[in-house]
């Protein structure tokens, strides 16, 4: 069994996974959305304090499996430094006290492995990762080789949803709020720009679109004067522009990549509008689409545990005294995760 810990942002999560069957024996997540909502986004120091309270409570519930643990896994990159530290400190303590190996896990690799929770892996695979911190298309050849084909030049998909929701005073997290409002809106009312539409670059950029939303809010008299229909129409128009941007760049990669299996992962992959758009794109290019179960789209320890099983089989351990937060360089196309 492997104990896995996730604390890269605002979700405190711990799981226990059986190594041989890959079955989840225990999984719990405590979200901090309510505490951060009034700020319109995650406050790192507050998140760290909340992790310090939540993680020990969850860990206490995993005590029945302690004697059977073979390893402990923890996210150590990328993420908020002060929140990663909480999970790492706990993992080091468990590893030392139980005298078991420690497995560091890259958070984005964990998201990819959310596809394989309680399942066998499927490689090779093209993956669109859309979350609060990242927007990337990754070619996953196997466990060892994951190459970034396209990445964001600025704001991620999840971040842009959150910031646009904040501009309209909708609340946090913005993704589900904008998606729900968009169902009642006219996506053609506001002519928002599709980023990099005329650029040959195979990359993502949402800062310009975000600014266009800000200017539209101002033209409507500010968030306070917007009607519910204004909010719905702007949400729908924004979501449509994001979709068109993602699809345009994805098509260029689909056209030259022979890999037949494609997946969407990350918190923003729960968006049903975007899922539907990519289902259509996969049919057009005759690719098979895969998605993680909705409960495993956002940050969770189950995906960290699933990745850790494959790492454990390859004996990718680290001395508990040597693990630390890894400073992640700005990721570019061509780089390996």
UniProtKB/Swiss-Prot annotation:
Primary localization class, coarse: cytoplasm
Cofactor binding note of this UniProt entry: Binds 1 Fe(2+) ion per subunit.
EC main group: transferase
Keywords: Acyltransferase, Cytoplasm, Iron, Metal-binding, Transferase, tRNA processing
Catalytic activity: L-threonylcarbamoyladenylate + adenosine(37) in tRNA = N(6)-L-threonylcarbamoyladenosine(37) in tRNA + AMP + H(+)
InterPro entries in UniProt: ATPase_NBD, Gcp-like_dom, KAE1/TsaD, TsaD
Residues annotated for substrate binding in this entry: 129-133, 162, 175, 271
Single GO MF annotation: N(6)-L-threonylcarbamoyladenine synthase activity
Compartments in which it is found: Cytoplasm
EC numbers on record: 2.3.1.234
Pfam family, one: TsaD
One GO BP: tRNA threonylcarbamoyladenosine modification
Chain positions recorded as Fe cation binding sites: 107, 111, 299
Cellular component, GO annotation: cytoplasm
Cofactor(s) needed for function: Fe(2+)
Function noted in UniProt: Required for the formation of a threonylcarbamoyl group on adenosine at position 37 (t(6)A37) in tRNAs that read codons beginning with adenine. Is involved in the transfer of the threonylcarbamoyl moiety of threonylcarbamoyl-AMP (TC-AMP) to the N6 group of A37, together with TsaE and TsaB. TsaD likely plays a direct catalytic role in this reaction.
PANTHER family listed in its UniProt record: TRNA N6-ADENOSINE THREONYLCARBAMOYLTRANSFERASE (PTHR11735), TRNA N6-ADENOSINE THREONYLCARBAMOYLTRANSFERASE, MITOCHONDRIAL (PTHR11735:SF6)
Family: Belongs to the KAE1 / TsaD family.
Name of the protein this chain belongs to: tRNA N6-adenosine threonylcarbamoyltransferase
UniProt source species: Sulfurovum sp. (strain NBC37-1)
Gene that produces this protein: tsaD
């Amino acid at each position: 069994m492997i104990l896995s810990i996730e604390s890269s942002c605002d979700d405190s999560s711990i799981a226990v996974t059986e190594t041989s069957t890959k079955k989840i024996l225990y999984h719990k997540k405590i979200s901090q959305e309510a505490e951060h909502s009034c700020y319109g986004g995650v406050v790192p120091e507050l998140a760290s304090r909340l992790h310090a309270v939540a993680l020990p409570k969850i860990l206490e519930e995993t005590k029945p499996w302690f004697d059977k643990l073979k390893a402990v896994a923890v996210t150590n990159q990328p993420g908020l430094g002060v929140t990663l530290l909480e999970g790492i400190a706990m993992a080091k303590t468990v590893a030392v006290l139980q005298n078991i190996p420690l497995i560091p896990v890259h958070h984005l690799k964990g998201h990819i492995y959310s596809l394989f929770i309680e399942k066998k892996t499927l490689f090779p695979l093209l993956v669109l990762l859309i979350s609060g911190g990242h927007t990337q298309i990754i070619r996953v050849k196997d466990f060892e080789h994951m190459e970034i084909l396209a990445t964001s030049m600025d704001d991620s998909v999840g971040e842009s949803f959150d910031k646009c929701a904040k501009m309209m005073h909708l609340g946090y997290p913005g993704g589900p709020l904008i998606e729900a409002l968009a169902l009642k809106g006219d996506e053609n009312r506001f002519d928002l720009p599709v980023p990099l539409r005329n650029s040959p670059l195979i990359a993502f950029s949402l800062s310009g679109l975000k600014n266009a939303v800000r200017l539209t809010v101002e033209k409507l008299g500010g968030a306070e004067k917007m009607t519910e229909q204004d909010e719905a129409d702007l949400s729908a128009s924004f979501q449509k522009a994001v979709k068109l941007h993602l699809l345009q760049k994805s098509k260029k990669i689909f056209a030259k990549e022979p890999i037949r299996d494609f997946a969407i992962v990350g918190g923003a992959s729960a968006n049903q509008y975007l899922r539907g758009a990519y289902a259509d794109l996969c049919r057009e290019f005759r690719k098979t689409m895969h998605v993680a179960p909705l409960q495993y789209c956002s940050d969770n320890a189950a995906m960290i545990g699933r990745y850790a099983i494959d790492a454990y089989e390859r004996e990718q351990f680290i001395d508990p005294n040597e693990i630390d937060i890894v400073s992640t360089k700005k990721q570019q196309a061509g780089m390996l995760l």
